[in-house]
Design a protein with these regions (language model features):
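Conserved strand-turn element in the central/C-terminal portion of the radical SAM core barrel
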Residues: 21, 164, 168-175, 237-246, ...
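Proteins enriched for Cys/Gly/acidic motifs involved in redox and nucleic-acid/cofactor modification
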Residues: 1-210, 251, 262, 266, ...
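Radical SAM/AdoMet-radical enzyme domain recognition
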Residues: 194, 221-235, 249-308
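Short, electropositive alpha-helical surface patch
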Residues: 215-226, 250-264, 317-334, 359-364, ...
Length: 453
């Protein structure tokens, strides 16, 4: 069997396989690590067989995500051990951040652990596990480090969270809230647009409070104006995810309404509408305050699209409170809704609360709310039939009979809200084309390219 590495093997000949689990924020972190390693002279592998080292970026937001991360790591270890050549596994991200030193004994299959806030040191870690420590060709951390794959790019504008919601482990995994520096964000956006990206999606745990820790008055509205200026020469789009009700200031609403590059797509994960449940969750607001907020947004931004999230089965949630959430979803007719059953997470305040809702009740409530969400979402999608919209071409699907183009329009967040399927017409990936929407199915739309536009 081959040795782990030999003294004659150069880093430029060694390749890294990247496996990413979890949310878009993890995708961004993986992208940065990949860029650092490429900059340092490593290559990228497509599978375990062709890799010299395997890096798995893990998620630990929920117990189920932690289990998936560990199971995937063990599956990769089995695949590695079945090969003709040993290769190390490096576990990165949320699981090492959450469980720390406990993993050394529990996962002897893993050669190294890299916490979420240590990922800029990934080159030194890979050098070490491959026996390349001390070599020349270190990565440069001063530039904009992103690889460009696809027509849309997620850009993190912050790290961590200060909310400490009773159900959420993120502050314990990712730390306290910290805004990313404005110029660093703008430089990254510029690099991505120059590389052919058409849409920038700004993300963070709580995007609406960007800049609040700077103490100089800069805020998300200010940042959006700056990002819009960067994407404007490219006819690019800007989308913001993970806003909170308290962050929807008049200034921010005005920017979303008045700056053409900023899409009128608002993602506000409310979790619940009942004041008692929200207070128990460690969140603020009430059903009436949320009702007033959405009425204001719809009035000030005509035609806007709303996405939200519902969390059911939180400790102490009664059937009446769940029914109130169900009715609120029906009343508000959100365009897109994600639904989650409460997960009891170690280390969170809610994990020690009494009146834990039985698992079967949680799952039943989640399914009932999901049924409503899908009914409303399918209806909202169908209402767009007959519209003429701009569509970014994201790819080509030739899996069925014939070939169709796949894209998304302004009211569809990438990898989230469905797509536009175009069965005729010519375009290439990255093109922005004018499309007539002629049909819908579930969250998907069917369109026809308008010639000459």
């Amino acid at each position: 069997m081959d040795s782990l590495s030999s003294s004659t093997t150069t880093a430029s000949a060694q390749r890294c396989l990247f496996v990413t689990l979890g949310c878009a924020k993890n995708e961004v972190d993986t992208d940065r690590m990949r860029s650092l390693l490429i900059d340092a002279g490593y290559g990228v592998a497509d599978d375990v067989d062709s890799a010299d080292v395997v890096l798995i970026n893990t998620c630990s937001f929920l117990a189920s995500a932690t289990s998936e991360s560990i199971d995937t790591t063990l599956d990769l270890a089995d695949e590695v051990s079945a090969g003709v050549r040993k290769k190390p596994i490096v576990m990165c991200g949320c699981v090492p951040s959450r469980y720390g030193d406990d993993l050394d004994e529990q996962l002897p299959e893993v050669a190294a652990f890299v916490k979420a806030d240590e990922e800029d040191g990934i080159v030194a870690v890979v050098d070490s596990v491959l026996g390349n420590a001390g070599r020349e060709g270190r990565a440069d951390l001063t530039g904009t480090l992103r690889t460009i794959e696809g027509t849309s790019a997620f850009v993190k504008i912050s790290e961590g969270c200060d909310r400490f919601c009773a159900f959420c482990a993120i502050p314990y995994i990712r730390g306290r809230y910290k805004s990313r520096e404005e110029q660093e964000i703008l430089d990254e956006v510029s690099s991505l647009m120059e590389g052919g990206v058409r849409e920038i999606v700004l993300i963070g745990q709580d995007t609406g409070i960007w800049g609040s820790d700077f103490g100089d008055g800069r805020n998300l509205a200010y940042l959006l104006r700056g990002v819009a200026e960067v994407v404007r020469p490219y006819d690019g789009w800007v989308r913001v995810l993970y806003l909170q009700p308290e962050g929807m200031t008049d200034e921010l609403v005005g920017v979303i309404r008045d700056v053409p590059e900023v899409l009128p797509y608002i993602d506000i994960p409310i979790q619940h509408c009942c004041e008692r449940v929200l207070k128990s969750m460690g969140r603020s607001g009430s059903e009436e305050q949320l009702r007033q907020l959405f009425a204001r947004l719809r009035s000030e931004i005509p035609g806007m699209v709303l996405r939200t999230t519902g969390l059911v089965g939180f400790p102490g949630e009664t059937e009446e409170e769940f029914e109130a959430l169900l009715d609120f979803f029906k009343e508000q007719e959100f365009d897109y809704m994600s639904v989650f059953p409460y997960s009891r997470e170690d280390g969170t305040k809610a994990a020690t609360m009494e009146e834990q809702v039985p698992e079967d009740v949680k799952m039943d409530r989640a399914q009932r709310l999901l049924d409503v969400a899908e009914e409303l979402g399918f209806s909202a999608t169908a209402k767009h039939v007959g519209e003429r919209v701009k569509v970014i071409i994201d790819g080509v699907d030739d899996s069925d009979d014939g070939v169709e183009l796949i894209g998304h329009t302004w009211f569809q967040a990438p990898d989230c809200d469905g797509a536009v399927h175009i069965e005729s017409g010519e375009a290439t990936v990255g093109d922005v084309v004018t499309v007539d929407l002629v049909d819908s199915f579930c969250y998907e739309l069917v369109g026809e390219i308008v010639d000459g536009e």
